[in-house]
Amino acid sequence: MYEIEKYVNVNIGGTALLLDLLTNTPHTVRRVVVAESRAIYGEGRYWSDDLNTYVYPLERPDETMARGDFEVKYPECTKPLRLVATTEDSAIHPNSVYGITKQVQGQLVHLVCKSIGVESVSFRYQNVYGPGQSLSNPYTGILSIFSTRIKNGNGINVFEDGRETRDFVYIDDVADATILGLEAEGVSGHAFNIGTGVATDVLTVANTLKKYYGIDVPVTVSGNYRLGDIRHNFADISQARR
């Protein structure tokens, strides 16, 4: 849950302050681009062969993960769920405080901007990586954290079974997309996933970085886990490509 008050004050309070200024003071702002997050999707979208439809699993329970069973489950389904790309019209069901604040942030921007005649666009960034990323926050910057440990000759601790996946997108691509969000026509009121559309597991990330740096450090798949972490999620980016 990690720094609850900070998430609420910055993401919701800061956005409310901005919208107050846009509503109550003279300005020349034409469009607001809000940085949402893939966290609003929670576990993301899956296909159920049992139900023959898309399903949206809830948070994985502690007792299940404690047994080393890390895959998501869904009531009434006996067959394994199949991970599919998460589209912008997928269910919004964040399973973290951070995700809830990003959901509210986006809703505030679209609601208020529409009422005051300002255009709005929201970008749902996937796992962004690149220079300048924090090394102290375990919920972001896994590539930076792993890279630093490898270059210092330290081993890497991979949580769960290492097969959890994320959609990793480079910061320059995110910056380019954000600029397009400011300039493109006909996008007001819409939300776009910003990612690569590729699911990469964490163990592959660790081994790829070792190979890139040419430094052999031990990679330990520990089975440790954090409640509230998602198992998988990757974006459908077809809307952003149009």
Task: State what each model feature region is.
Residues 15-16, 103-110, 143-147, 176, ...:
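Conserved active-site helix of classical SDR/Rossmann-fold NAD(P)-dependent CH-OH oxidoreductases
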Residues 74-96, 118-134, 145-169, 193:
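A conserved pocket-lining segment of Rossmann-fold NAD(P)-dependent short-chain dehydrogenase/reductase
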Residues 150-242:
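C-terminal substrate-binding subdomain of Rossmann-fold SDR/epimerase-dehydratase oxidoreductases
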Residues 6, 48-53, 139-141, 175, ...:
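Glycine-rich, phosphate-binding/catalytic loops in enzymes
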Residues 43-48, 133-137, 205-207, 231-233:
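Short aromatic-enriched loop/helix-cap "lid" or pocket-rim segments at secondary-structure transitions
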Residues 16, 44, 101, 132-134, ...:
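Gly/Ser/Thr-rich beta-alpha loop segments that engage phosphate groups in nucleotides
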Residues 1-126:
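N-terminal Rossmann-like NAD(P)+-binding domain of SDR-like oxidoreductases, especially those catalyzing
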Residues 2, 10-13, 89, 96, ...:
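Residue-level signal for the nucleotide or nucleotide-sugar donor/cofactor binding architecture
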